[in-house]
């Protein structure tokens, strides 16, 4: 949506992700990321850590379950989402403001680690962020080679999410939309785009 602050944070998980379910059954995982800037001091010839930024993150639905199953305390992660500000009064009546991240994408950093990714089946019907080269049209299909047949799908935060605002990105207007590598795009070439292809998207 227009006017939202989208940021990407790279840091380490402070705790294991905490998975919970709303009364309607939607999964939500909360976790905290510590991002610490490092600079090289030429005088002492060593790296120095700056002040850490601690950010509480929340991710919804199938992605929440995937995060809870895949990530652990101490792992280095890359998190992208919408920065939100929330104000409240503490027990002493002092007004406080916190910043939180409503996560769109999250993954392990492979700078100093390896990972084997396993694609999950879409149980939650979450709409789509396409993978590399995700197609155009109304709704985008997901991942490497996934395609949507033009049927509108649910997306965004669940109905009982207090931060939900308006229609999710993509508009849920149907119209098809290929996903990722090997997927078809909007009504072109007639393929369903369901299989994996080694062909790069460019």
Swiss-Prot record:
GO biological process, one term: DNA replication
Biased composition (Gly residues): 124-157, 168-196
GO cellular component annotations of the record: nucleoid
InterPro entries to which the protein is assigned, alphabetical: NA-bd_OB-fold, Primosome_PriB/ssb, ssDNA-bd
Record CDD domains: SSB_OBF (cd04496)
Domain SSB: 1-110
Molecular function in Gene Ontology: single-stranded DNA binding
Start and end residues of each stretch annotated as Disordered: 115-202
Keywords: DNA-binding
Assembly with partners or alone: Homotetramer.
Name of the molecule in the record: Single-stranded DNA-binding protein 1
Species of the source: Streptomyces avermitilis (strain ATCC 31267 / DSM 46492 / JCM 5070 / NBRC 14893 / NCIMB 12804 / NRRL 8165 / MA-4680)
Gene that this polypeptide is encoded by: ssb1
